[in-house]
């Protein structure tokens, strides 16, 4: 948020904001817009010299009838179990195909306090295989036109140019900047806003159904506070 903004260095005659959202359902858009409002207010609370709105809201034109779902779990095992349950529910009860669904998480691995690495991809893959759910990984070569062979597993960086009818976001605890205060330095505020943007990016990739599975709550994470308050 403290980096040079392009529009301040380029002369232009008109500034046009595209607000109509033809891709996402009203339920998803309303949830994201609330997140935008809370995030923008919190950023201004942290730094009152931010000149522009960071997160822009949109206007939905259709409804899906499916509310955004937030699932609170205790640990990583519960997260993976909940992810598999959500996928099975979407396929068996809601009529989605596996290729309509993506599971999105921040990074490829997680470091524990003892220094060991938990490979979330491996644990999720094994659980999907045990449940006979087909899956594929997203990378830089995957586009919306790429034939999908099952549920897409992706980190936030690979998902940013894709869209899916249903997205399950998990492992947001892997984000580094969970809490911040006005007393923190500018670079810490900037890093926190960067993590908010990762969450925002993941949510904007979904069309009809969004589920967020987390073990943190609003007391332990400002990110989750902005998501659920």
Where are these regions (language model features)?
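Conserved coupling/interface region of RecA-like P-loop/ASCE motor cores
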Residues: 3-56
């Amino acid at each position: 948020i403290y980096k040079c903004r392009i529009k301040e260095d380029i002369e232009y005659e008109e500034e046009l904001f595209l607000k109509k959202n033809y891709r996402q359902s009203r339920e998803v858009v309303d949830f994201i817009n609330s997140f935008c409002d809370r995030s923008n207010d919190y950023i201004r609370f942290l730094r009152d010299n931010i000149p522009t709105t960071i997160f822009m809201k949109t206007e939905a034109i259709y409804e899906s009838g499916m509310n955004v779902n937030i699932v609170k779990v205790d640990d990583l095992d519960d997260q993976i179990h909940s992810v598999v349950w959500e996928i099975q529910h979407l396929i068996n009860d809601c009529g989605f195909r596996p290729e309509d669904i993506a599971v999105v998480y921040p990074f490829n691995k997680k470091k524990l306090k003892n220094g060991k690495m938990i490979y979330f991809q491996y644990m999720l893959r094994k659980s999907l295989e045990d449940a006979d759910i087909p899956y594929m990984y997203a990378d830089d070569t995957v586009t919306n036109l790429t034939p999908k062979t099952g549920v897409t597993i992706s980190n936030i960086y690979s998902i940013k140019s894709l869209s899916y009818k249903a997205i399950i976001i998990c492992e947001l605890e892997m984000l580094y900047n969970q809490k911040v205060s006005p007393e923190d330095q500018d670079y810490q505020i900037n890093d926190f806003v960067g993590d908010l943007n990762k969450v925002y990016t993941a949510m904007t990739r979904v069309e009809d159904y969004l589920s967020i599975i987390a073990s943190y709550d609003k007391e332990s994470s400002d990110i989750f506070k902005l998501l659920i308050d």
